[in-house]
């Protein structure tokens, strides 16, 4: 007879269910109350008795927590028990599986330092011998050595079976100071790859010679990083990759990375950082020739984006030499290829690198590859040079979207566009040779302006946008039309009101009268400096008093 518990949460899920302990193992099934699609789609969880390893009892988020360490399925967490359930669970596990349930007390001091223990299925952060928190390896998506003494851990939020309630932690960083010293002997070699035993190399048939030991320093952070990668088994082994591409140049995130493509994921291995993304994260694959006619770009739209600290990368931009070719053979068994990949992939490729990579990604992700469409610029290219804010780049008018490269990468589907405004960039002689293209989005979501596009491209670009049934508004043309209309109406009114005023023929003005002599004299007095003097001199000498002679 089995033992059942209701309202139990599996692995911090949103929904509760029924937990059952039976002789054959453990089971959990989500409650069907509510009838939601999410509830009905969740499959029951079953764990055979042979998978049980250790069981721990401790305080949890919703009461008491039962943590089960399995042999091959990681850590299973069941939360929502009451304190009274402990004795029943303890007796059941001992009677059915001969396993002791260990009571575990957590440290509640709230300190942010302690010691880490990389256990079988999880990383334990402990303080004074008591665990503060645990991180199951299955929840770790990636880890990077972010600096000399710092290790960053990114958590997996893409697991469809993992549906946590509320906010979700996406990254955690550990500061690990100090260094460790290891003795390295250049004349020593491992006896076997799987063994830690070392033996001296034989040089010229001599044995037992003195060997020189070199001391190598390694930071504690680097040692922790390497051990965590090994324990957590982050990413598949390189030998399991279906196909690999070496030293591929990325403009976003900038650097060179080795690309290992697996059945369900892709790993990018750089000198400093490594990234991992699932195939289902790839939303679009865009293959575009670069305007320099030397390189070719392959863009992957990622949702949710890759993260590196506070920086997110919603687009991965790969750059190849246009004529670079590669020859690869897929690492697949013939039976596996015939059964699962025959209609999607080729067994062997010998073509240009960007074509090979895009075809492989298309086959594994079931996403079509977007290529340039009908638009051609005046210089027979599929893009026009422009700028977005302070960044220069190229605008690709595709058949169903605007695409701007390279920084920042912008993708604007035509279905989101309300209208397109074409306006001049300025009024000076230099800026009048360019125009702005403002893309107004629907539902009042703002607009995006691409500036400094050559005037030579305006007519072709405008015709292309109209052919895609986009509403195009040319502000300059409307202003000119309004101005011409206004000027035309003014000239008509002047012709009507002025009559013959514009003629050059002279006519007599009847209101004009010739001034009299007195008026002329007054004018002369005003403007002729000699006028007053002449009047004074015009008088007789008799009226002028004679000057008395000087008497000596």
Swiss-Prot record:
Gene Ontology terms, MF aspect: DNA binding
UniProt biased composition (Basic and acidic residues): 190-205, 541-552
Domain of life: Eukaryota
Annotated phenotype, changing residue 78 to R: In pob3-1; causes severe defects in rate of growth
Compartment annotation: Nucleus; Chromosome
Statement: the UniProt record of this protein carries the keyword DNA repair: yes
Keyword annotations from UniProtKB, A to Z: Chromosome, DNA damage, DNA repair, DNA replication, Nucleus, Transcription, Transcription regulation
Entry's Gene Ontology cellular component terms: chromatin; FACT complex
Biased segments, Acidic residues type: 490-529
Assembly, per entry: Forms a stable heterodimer with SPT16. The SPT16-POB3 dimer weakly associates with multiple molecules of NHP6 (NHP6A or NHP6B) to form the FACT (yFACT or SNP) complex. The FACT complex interacts with the CK2 (casein kinase II) complex subunits CKA1, CKA2, CKB1 and CKB2 and the components of the transcription machinery CHD1, CTR9, PAF1 and CDC73. The FACT complex interacts with the PAF1 complex. SPT16 interacts with SAS3 and POL1. Interacts directly with RFA1.
Note: In contrast to the orthologous protein in animals and plants, this protein does not contain a HMG box DNA-binding domain. This function may instead be provided by the HMG box of the associated NHP6A/NHP6B proteins in the FACT complex of yeast. Present with 22400 molecules/cell in log phase SD medium.
Name this polypeptide is given: FACT complex subunit POB3
Organism: Saccharomyces cerevisiae (strain ATCC 204508 / S288c)
Gene symbol of the encoding locus: POB3
């Amino acid at each position: 007879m089995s033992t059942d518990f209701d309202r139990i949460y599996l692995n911090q899920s949103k929904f509760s269910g029924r937990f059952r302990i039976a002789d054959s193992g453990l089971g959990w099934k989500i409650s069907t109350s509510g009838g939601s699609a999410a509830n009905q789609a969740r499959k029951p969880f079953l764990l055979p008795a042979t998978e049980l390893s250790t069981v721990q009892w401790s305080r949890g988020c919703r009461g008491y927590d039962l943590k089960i360490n399995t042999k091959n399925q990681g850590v299973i967490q069941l939360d929502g028990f009451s304190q009274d359930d402990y004795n029943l669970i303890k007796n059941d596990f001992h009677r059915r599986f001969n396993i002791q349930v260990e009571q575990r007390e957590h440290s509640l001091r709230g300190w942010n330092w302690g010691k880490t223990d990389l256990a079988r299925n999880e990383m334990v952060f402990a303080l004074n011998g008591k665990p503060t928190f645990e991180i199951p390896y299955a929840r770790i998506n990636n880890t990077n050595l972010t600096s000399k003494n710092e290790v960053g851990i990114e958590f997996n939020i893409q697991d469809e079976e993992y549906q946590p309630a509320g906010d979700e932690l996406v990254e955690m960083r550990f500061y690990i100071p100090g260094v460790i010293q290891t003795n390295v002997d250049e004349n020593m070699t491992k006896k076997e790859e799987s063994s830690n035993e070392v033996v001296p190399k034989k040089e010229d048939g001599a044995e037992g010679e003195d060997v020189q030991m070199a001391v190598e320093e390694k930071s504690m952070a680097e040692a922790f990083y390497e051990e965590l990668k090994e324990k957590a088994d982050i990413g598949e082994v390189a030998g399991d990759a279906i196909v690999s591409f070496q030293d591929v140049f990325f403009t976003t995130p900038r650097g060179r990375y080795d690309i290992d493509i697996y059945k369900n994921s892709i790993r990018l291995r750089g000198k400093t950082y490594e990234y991992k993304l699932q195939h289902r994260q790839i939303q679009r694959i865009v293959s575009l020739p670069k305007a320099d006619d030397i390189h070719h770009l392959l863009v992957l739209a990622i949702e949710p984006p890759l993260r590196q600290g506070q920086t997110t990368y919603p687009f991965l931009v790969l750059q190849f030499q246009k004529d670079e070719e590669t020859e690869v053979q897929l690492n697949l068994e013939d039976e596996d290829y015939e059964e699962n990949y025959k209609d999607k992939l080729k067994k062997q490729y010998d073509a240009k690198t960007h074509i090979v990579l895009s075809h492989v990604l298309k086959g594994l992700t079931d996403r079509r590859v977007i290529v340039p469409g009908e638009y051609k610029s005046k210089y027979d290219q599929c893009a026009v040079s422009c700028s977005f804010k302070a960044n220069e780049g190229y605008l690709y008018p595709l058949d169903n979207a605007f695409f701007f490269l390279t920084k920042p990468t912008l993708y604007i589907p035509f279905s989101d566009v309300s209208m397109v405004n074409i306006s001049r960039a300025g009024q000076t002689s230099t800026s009048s040779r360019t125009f702005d293209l403002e893309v107004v989005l629907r539902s009042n979501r703002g607009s995006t302006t691409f500036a400094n596009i050559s005037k030579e491209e305006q007519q072709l670009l405008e015709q292309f946008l109209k052919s895609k049934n986009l509403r195009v508004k040319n502000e300059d043309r409307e202003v000119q039309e309004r101005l011409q209309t206004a000027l035309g109406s003014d000239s008509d009114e002047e012709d009507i009101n002025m009559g013959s005023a514009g003629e050059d023929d002279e006519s007599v003005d009847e209101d004009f009268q010739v001034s009299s002599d007195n008026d002329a004299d007054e004018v002369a007095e005003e403007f002729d400096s000699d006028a007053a003097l002449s009047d004074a001199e015009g008088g007789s000498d008799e009226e002028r008093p004679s000057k008395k002679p000087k008497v000596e």
